[in-house]
């Protein structure tokens, strides 16, 4: 089967998997979430457990009535209660993916990270992986971390490398990801401590820590993604995945891709027992739909 190179292929690939993914949605009370749910049902790859805040349950009630075979409704007291119940559905094995609705991200993360009742895997690092469908590229672009870890340690970078290579394989079907370690400089120097962490990642990769993988860096984004720029500098490493030095660089790249690059960007949290879809309120319905689709594919191809 050919690797997935753009988002349009995702729904068909999910149908081919012949496995309907169950998604627990915390507080589905906005029009974008409503659209994503109906579109996913129409594409025949997901069913839903909607955990609605009693004060704003109209959309959830309507969806449960319209799709009785695809939607289960649970009514919670408030957003915090909705988050706890949605996480419980995942923790107890009734749902494969967790999705944020119209509640604040903090409400959901409190439930996800709860030491007794959450779904963060013990000893794991919670991080965000984004996947971009960029018109100028002939493959999907994966990058991390744009949302969770402000300044990753060497140990956290190691976790990010493991997560992003595994996520690339589970979503695209490709077997040899190419990873660029992004920085403003292309030289390893004590003046830039992060470049020293990158050297450790490359050593880990050489020892097989991330499976079959090509890894290079430090390098800037243009060198990483544009073969001509790399050739001019004598660096042959255009890639499908990027690891950013900190959250500021990753988040800026995320927003720039959508605003100026015409990209559609999907994203999920990993390090948990199931993928967690946490999109921004400003994200488009397309972005939210493909975030769910990529999370569902990751859940199937664990």
Spans of features found by a protein language model:
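Anion-binding alpha/beta catalytic cores of soluble intermediary-metabolism enzymes, centered on
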Residues: 1-302
